[in-house]
Regions:
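A structural signal for short hydrophobic/aromatic patches embedded in well-ordered alpha helices
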Residues: 12-13, 74
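Intrinsic disorder at enzyme termini
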Residues: 1-8
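Glycine-rich flavin
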Residues: 21-112
Length: 112
């Protein structure tokens, strides 16, 4: 039985860590905390481009179709970098809705 991360999970973790290091400065966190909506929207667009909004959304609904462990790895990286994003709430909503046949899953996956 294998208890380590898969190669894909390690790659996901490294990608998110690199993104956080390069894109999420303390100044950016402060700007968003102070209500800079455009800064928050730009960050959200970048996270969508990485495919993180649809991490737990099934592929048939426009997402990545990954699992809860993958989402936990992303959240861990976000926590380390104090990333002010709605990743966790969107992920929980997507996970709850994934078997419902809801058309909103595609909207979650595409940050709509």
């Amino acid at each position: 039985m294998e208890f380590g991360l898969s190669e894909d999970q390690v790659m996901l973790q490294e990608t998110v860590r690199r993104f956080v290091a390069e894109e999420v400065s303390l100044d950016l966190v402060r700007q968003i905390a102070e209500g800079e909506i455009q800064v928050a929207e730009t960050l959200a667009e970048k996270l969508t481009a990485l495919g993180l909004d649809g991490l737990l959304v099934p592929e048939k609904d426009g997402g990545s179709g990954l699992g809860v462990l993958d989402a936990a790895l992303v959240q861990e990286c976000f926590g380390y970098g104090i990333v002010p994003a709605r990743f966790l709430s969107n992920s929980v909503a997507a996970y709850a809705l994934r078997d419902s046949g809801s058309s909103i899953l595609n909207d979650i996956a595409n940050n709509d």
